[in-house]
Amino acid sequence: NIAIIDQARNGTGCAIVHSDDEVGIQHLNQEAAKAMAAGNRAGYDISKAHAMRWITSNPAKAAGILNQTGSIEVGKDADVVLWTGDPFSVYSRAEKVLIDGALAFDMKDPKIQPITDFDLGIIQPQTNRVN
């Protein structure tokens, strides 16, 4: 469905990969990969760069804040994830995460690896089990 919405209005649709689920929100890149693969199988020519917009600039556009965030440009707010490999692969891991320009996670530095429910496993994702 994402690829179909993406191709609406002569390819100017504003497709978004989203999740209301506490687990799914942590895997939007993989959901985008599945949608890209399904779209390509259906005959749409969807590049990885184009599919990346489904989880970056398109949500910002839909929220009316594309002038503030959604892409890496001078003057825009951005949180950035550097991956160990292809961000659409289930085998890639977040190597570094920058939030508001500050290093928030570094897989090679144990001092910058916050404990999260993602690391602990999801039992009841609605509750805070870290503290």
Each PLM stretch: what is its role?
Residues K61, E73-F118:
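C-terminal cap of metal-dependent C-N hydrolases
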Residues P87, I99, I122-N131:
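C-terminal recognition in membrane/secretory proteostasis and scaffolding
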Residues N1-W83, L103:
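His/Asp/Glu-enriched, well-ordered alpha-helical/loop segment
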Residues N40-Y44, F105-D109, G121-Q124:
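Glycine-rich loops and low-complexity Gly/Arg-rich segments
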Residues N1, I112-Q113, V130-N131:
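Extracytoplasmic and endomembrane cell-envelope/extracellular-matrix remodeling and assembly machinery
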Residues D21-E22, I115-G121, Q126:
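Metal-coordinating catalytic core of metallo-dependent amide/deamination hydrolases
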